């Protein structure tokens, strides 16, 4: 009879999950014993990087990725990254070793309350009742992670379970998509067909459901302006399309003003709505009807206004497109192109983003963790292909550096660029070592404004004055740090050096880091 370990690896092969992201400890060694030659183990030097790489890999493959962490301390180190995966709705199977069942009652060293620790930010958290249940629980975790709304699932596995005997699992498959109610889709189509001035808001659920281009067809049929929802972790509409109007602001008053004048607003794969600072105002103007489609029932339930339907966003979009008649409506005017920023030293963030955009490959995937520079990034860099833009939907830091490495390992032929702030880059800097070790040729561009400028902007917005400590970050040699972890790079301080340096980073054929020193301007939030 096979061991639990052998049965589990057979299961993972069948699921196509042969890459394991991990940082091993004593409670994980029994799982890694006799590691199969057809599997790949990707080592991260800290668990936040492990989980971030796994999330990027899952976003690249479209399937749940497997991460293996070291009991309670390792899971604790990874919880910030788990929160990001939860908000991004990225499917992950996260496992951790638990102490040996045979003396758990004595609470030996490394015994942990793992199931409870993971629970707030996973779709499910399990520990098998019996050793022979381990393969079935991992299969359950995989299908739970993949079922909409997708997300991370945690399994705690006692270290002595792996050598126990287990019966082979019976054949079992799950269809993970759930269609929205067809009557609701017909009703929505009728309302949209009669609308005088409809608008569309797209969110990450559009991209997750593979409907990036389908959303374009729907918007064109409606001749409706399209906005990206606030703080979206994925781009969901081609941003060079004439119907695209930009990103909605994450504040009630300003968002409602942006959507004013539209009698119907169709929100696809996004909350209604995601805000950040409290700015009182209506959700939308009183005359505006909101139609909401999301794969997440909680997202639909907490919406403040409108009519919601739960189901696969891509299926809903295709259903609406088929039902809607063509309209004779003048499309809205396209956005004005941004002004070309001036070349100067110190460089402005606008100039840096404009220069990156001028040489960025059309099929590049960009991982953005710029915080204070995000508005300028969206002004100059447009994403018109699926999988082109990734950021954290949780608002925390530390995802994009390891996320870009994991994505590159999943999609090795696609150019990957990580644009990251100086403060952000230090949260999961260990990912640079993994990039070098596994040949993930990501171009890392560190925007160095020598501080937490986004917090300075928030400080100014709330009138906190100038005596707020902890907002300056100086004295870090980012190129030196990268070289110490095996990644070459260079410092860029002069505007004339920027373009050739970016070209070198993009064409290096290996991971490469640019530290770009910019004017430490403080952004004006919600201006």
Regions flagged by a language model, labelled:
Residues 4, 132, 168-170, 287-370, ...:
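Phosphate/pyrophosphate-binding active-site segments
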Residues 203-208, 340-341, 421-423:
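Conserved short loop/turn motifs at secondary-structure junctions
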Residues 58, 145, 219, 357, ...:
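N-terminal cationic-hydrophobic initiation segments that often serve targeting/anchoring roles
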Residues 1-324, 359-362, 441-444, 461-464, ...:
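N-terminal alpha/beta PP-like core and its mobile active-site loop of ThDP/TPP-dependent enzymes
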Residues 121, 336, 485-486:
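Bateman (tandem CBS) regulatory domains
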Residues 95, 104-110, 250, 256, ...:
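Thiamine diphosphate
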Residues 24-25, 96, 159, 230, ...:
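Short, small-residue-rich loop/turn micro-motifs
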Residues 3-18, 23-26, 31-33, 333-411:
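Active-site diphosphate/adenylate-binding microenvironment
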């Amino acid at each position: 009879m096979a061991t639990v370990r052998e049965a589990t690896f057979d299961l993972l092969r069948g699921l196509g999950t042969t890459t394991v992201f991990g940082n091993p400890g004593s409670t994980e060694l029994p799982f890694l014993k006799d590691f199969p030659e057809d599997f790949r183990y990707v080592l991260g030097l800290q668990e936040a990087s492990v989980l971030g790489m796994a999330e990027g890999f899952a976003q690249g493959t479209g399937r749940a990725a497997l991460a293996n962490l070291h009991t309670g301390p390792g899971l604790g180190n990874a919880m910030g990254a788990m929160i990001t995966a939860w908000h991004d709705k990225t499917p992950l199977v996260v496992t951790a070793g638990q102490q040996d069942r045979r003396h758990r009652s004595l609470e030996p060293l490394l015994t942990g309350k793992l199931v409870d620790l993971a629970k707030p930010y996973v779709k499910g958290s399990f520990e098998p009742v019996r050793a022979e249940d381990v393969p079935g629980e991992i299969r359950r975790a995989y299908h739970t992670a993949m079922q909409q709304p997708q997300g991370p699932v945690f399994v705690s596995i006692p270290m002595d379970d792996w050598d126990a005997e287990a019966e082979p699992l019976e054949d079992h498959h799950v269809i993970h998509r759930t269609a929205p109610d067809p009557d609701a889709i017909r009703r929505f189509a009728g309302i949209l067909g009669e609308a005088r001035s409809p608008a569309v808001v797209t969110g990450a659920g559009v991209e997750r459901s593979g409907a990036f281009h389908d959303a374009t067809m729907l918007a064109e049929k409606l001749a409706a302006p399209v906005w990206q929802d606030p703080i979206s972790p994925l781009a969901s509409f081609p941003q060079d399309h004439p119907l695209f109007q930009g990103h909605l602001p994450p504040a009630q008053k300003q968002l409602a003003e942006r959507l004013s004048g539209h009698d119907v607003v169709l929100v696809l794969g996004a909350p209604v709505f995601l805000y950040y600072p409290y700015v009182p105002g209506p959700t939308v103007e009183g005359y505006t009807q909101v139609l909401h489609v999301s794969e997440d029932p909680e997202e639909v339930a907490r919406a403040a206004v409108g009519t919601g339907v739960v189901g696969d966003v891509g299926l809903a979009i295709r259903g609406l497109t088929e039902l809607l008649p063509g309209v004779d409506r003048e499309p809205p005017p396209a956005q004005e192109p941004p002004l070309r920023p001036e070349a100067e030293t110190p460089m402005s963030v606008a100039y840096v983003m404009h220069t990156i955009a001028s040489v960025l490959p059309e099929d590049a995937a960009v991982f953005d963790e710029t915080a204070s520079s995000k508005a300028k990034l969206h002004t100059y860099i447009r994403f018109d292909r699926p999988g082109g833009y990734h950021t954290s939907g949780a608002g925390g830091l530390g995802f994009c550096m390891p996320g870009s490495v994991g994505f590159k390992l999943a999609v090795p032929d696609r150019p990957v660029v990580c644009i990251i702030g100086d403060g952000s880059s230090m949260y999961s800097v260990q990912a640079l070592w993994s990039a070098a070790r596994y040949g993930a040729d990501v171009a890392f561009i560190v925007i160095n404004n020598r501080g937490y400028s986004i917090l300075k902007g928030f400080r100014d917005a709330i009138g906190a004055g100038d005596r707020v400590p902890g907002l300056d970050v100086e004295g870090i040699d980012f190129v030196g740090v990268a070289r110490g972890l095996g990644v070459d790079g260079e410092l860029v301080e002069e505007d004339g050096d920027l373009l050739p340096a970016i070209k070198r980073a993009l064409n290096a054929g290996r991971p490469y880091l640019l530290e770009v020193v910019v004017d430490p301007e403080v952004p004006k939030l919600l201006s």
